[in-house]
């Protein structure tokens, strides 16, 4: 099995990259892909860059060039669920765009023409992630993760997301674009991210302060998940 892993930022991939044995670096379309073995398992780790376009471009290049069997999207996210705090884990059962609006033509808010309203994560990957969470004794929430090209840092943006997606547990900037590409390629995916901030008026301050905490937690989760997927 070859496992594809996608993170947007240097801080979100550096700990995993340093653990890859026999590492080789491929630069394509402004993205960097690191291939090798993570604890004996073949992996391809992509640093995509921030935002939906960068994430979709990178995911497409990763799938075409490295042919992974599954995709894990990792990194940080802003917490929306009331039980979440910095360092906690969110696992997607579905992802949706929070900044797409074609409702004038009868589509659901967040749905693009020709696409499902949301992109469902793979049940087996979800189950494996939840098993890792239990083993690591981490606090986690599974649910809807929403994505858009905006860092949510204020009451207006937050209120709009809560109105349109009252069940959303986290918000970030890449996951749905990655899920969209995986859907088109028919490749199983799951989002496993750690909370770096709560999406409020101080989120930009807590993000800068706690990104390293989120990166450490998400790296631990992904490393454990890769082991479980490879060896059961």
UniProtKB/Swiss-Prot annotation:
Keyword flag Hydrolase: yes
Enzyme class, first EC level, given as a word: hydrolase
Residues annotated for substrate binding in this entry: 78, 152, 173-174
Species, as recorded: Salmonella paratyphi C (strain RKS4594)
Pfam families, per database record: PNP_UDP_1
Catalytic activity: S-adenosyl-L-homocysteine + H2O = S-(5-deoxy-D-ribos-5-yl)-L-homocysteine + adenine; S-methyl-5'-thioadenosine + H2O = 5-(methylsulfanyl)-D-ribose + adenine; 5'-deoxyadenosine + H2O = 5-deoxy-D-ribose + adenine
Gene: mtnN
Protein's recorded name: 5'-methylthioadenosine/S-adenosylhomocysteine nucleosidase
Enzyme Commission number(s) from the entry: 3.2.2.9
Chain segments annotated as coiled-coil in the UniProt record: none
Residues the record marks as active site: 12, 197
Task performed by this protein: Catalyzes the irreversible cleavage of the glycosidic bond in both 5'-methylthioadenosine (MTA) and S-adenosylhomocysteine (SAH/AdoHcy) to adenine and the corresponding thioribose, 5'-methylthioribose and S-ribosylhomocysteine, respectively. Also cleaves 5'-deoxyadenosine, a toxic by-product of radical S-adenosylmethionine (SAM) enzymes, into 5-deoxyribose and adenine. Thus, is required for in vivo function of the radical SAM enzymes biotin synthase and lipoic acid synthase, that are inhibited by 5'-deoxyadenosine accumulation.
Xref: CDD domains: MTAN
Annotated keywords: Amino-acid biosynthesis, Hydrolase, Methionine biosynthesis
Classification via InterPro entries: MTA_SAH_Nsdase, Nucleoside_phosphorylase_d, Nucleoside_phosphorylase_sf
Single annotated GO MF: methylthioadenosine nucleosidase activity
The UniProt record lists the keyword Acyltransferase: no
Quaternary structure (record): Homodimer.
Any single GO CC term annotated in Swiss-Prot or TrEMBL for this entry: cytosol
Pathway annotation: Amino-acid biosynthesis; L-methionine biosynthesis via salvage pathway; S-methyl-5-thio-alpha-D-ribose 1-phosphate from S-methyl-5'-thioadenosine (hydrolase route): step 1/2
Family affiliation: Belongs to the PNP/UDP phosphorylase family. MtnN subfamily.
Biological process (GO), any one: purine deoxyribonucleoside catabolic process
Gene3D superfamilies, per the entry: Nucleoside phosphorylase domain (3.40.50.1580)
């Amino acid at each position: 099995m070859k496992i594809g892993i996608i993170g947007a930022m240097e801080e979100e991939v550096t700990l995993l990259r340093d653990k890859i044995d026999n590492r080789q670096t491929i630069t394509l379309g402004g993205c960097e892909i690191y291939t090798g073995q993570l604890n004996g398992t073949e992996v391809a780790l992509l640093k995509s860059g921030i935002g939906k376009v960068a994430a979709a471009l990178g995911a497409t290049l990763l799938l075409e060039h490295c042919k992974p069997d599954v995709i894990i999207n990792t990194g940080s996210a802003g917490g929306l669920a009331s039980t979440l705090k910095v360092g906690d884990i969110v696992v997607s059962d579905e992802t949706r765009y929070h900044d797409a609006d074609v409702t004038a033509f009868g589509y659901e808010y967040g749905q693009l023409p020709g696409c499902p309203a949301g992109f469902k994560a793979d049940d087996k990957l979800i189950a494996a992630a939840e098993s890792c969470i239990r083993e690591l004794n981490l606090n986690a929430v599974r649910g809807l993760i929403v994505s858009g090209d905006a860092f949510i840092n204020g009451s207006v943006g937050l209120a709009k997301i809560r109105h349109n997606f009252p069940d959303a547990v986290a918000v970030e900037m890449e996951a749905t674009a990655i899920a969209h590409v995986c859907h088109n390629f028919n490749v199983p995916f799951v989002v496993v991210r750690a909370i770096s901030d709560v999406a409020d008026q101080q989120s930009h301050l807590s993000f800068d302060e706690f990104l390293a905490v989120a990166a450490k937690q998400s790296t631990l989760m992904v490393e454990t998940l890769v082991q479980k997927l490879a060896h059961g």
